[in-house]
């Protein structure tokens, strides 16, 4: 099969981990006789340097003509000053909005060989395997009104409003129900309905949609309670659905269960994934650009590699190939190979390129 992909290496360690992801994808293409055409674009700090914006209209147009988009990392400390007119992260927000990517899917699975790598007791994290579904294009991050001002008396103020429409909530919640149906048929909806009106609407709509999924067990949990339970009993969860800001915070917390943010992939989809269908999406590791370790061959490429597996599953309809990448990662970890972020005594330490080569080697036989 033939596919056209837009590749956005981005900033910091982005180009390094992307190179390893494509190395593994090329191994899959060779084995299964697929063709992947890569077209490259700029995003983030490197795009600001060259074009003065974090995402150009040309790059966005290129993404829209692709079967899927691969992104590595966005962020550059040179642009951290909040007074600057443009920031690297603006490009990512514009990309999500421009491509209609409303559903962020983040699997959190702890490999048996990494149960001792997390800062949490092994007996707690062992067996953790759940999926976070985060609404991505609404809520406070896309606030309207959103402003900052100084009052006549000289007091500085700022406001960000959290707004959700019924349609925005319904489509992301249906993603949650569909994925729950393909797993253990258990869905946890996270909100703050004891305080926020937007959360009360969220909960009401979840209750209404649940009638269409009588085979799914639904639980409502407040965001603060969820934050505690993720650390105390992560194996309790299977599929979690929540709004934008809550999901942003909780998924970073959950990443520590796997021992490193370098282990966790993500997919941002423009539709509801269903078996036998292809859904346009953006695929990226959940980690940042990590500029302090860039160009040192020490970054962990596994999150990028697993993101490519998600792309094969959701946007290419290639479940067998996706599962093979995931199995290859498990085999490499079980054999004791590790990058510095997950290294422990007894492991064989590998650099970024070497880790990618090991995984590609297993796929290539």
Swiss-Prot record:
Classification via InterPro entries: IsoCit/isopropylmalate_DH_CS, IsoPropMal-DH-like_dom, Isopropylmalate_DH
Main location: cytoplasm
Keyword Cytoplasm attached: yes
Binding of Mg(2+), residues: 224, 248, 252
Coiled coil: none
GO molecular function, one term: magnesium ion binding
Binding site for NAD(+): 288-300
A GO cellular component entry from the record: cytosol
Protein's pathway: Amino-acid biosynthesis; L-leucine biosynthesis; L-leucine from 3-methyl-2-oxobutanoate: step 3/4
Reaction catalyzed: (2R,3S)-3-isopropylmalate + NAD(+) = 4-methyl-2-oxopentanoate + CO2 + NADH
Swiss-Prot/TrEMBL GO biological process terms: L-leucine biosynthetic process
Catalytic activity, EC: 1.1.1.85
Annotated binding of substrate, by residue: 96, 106, 134, 224
SUPFAM superfamilies for the chain: Isocitrate/Isopropylmalate dehydrogenase-like (SSF53659)
UniProt-listed PANTHER family: 3-ISOPROPYLMALATE DEHYDROGENASE
Similarity section: Belongs to the isocitrate and isopropylmalate dehydrogenases family. LeuB type 1 subfamily.
Name of the protein in its database record: 3-isopropylmalate dehydrogenase
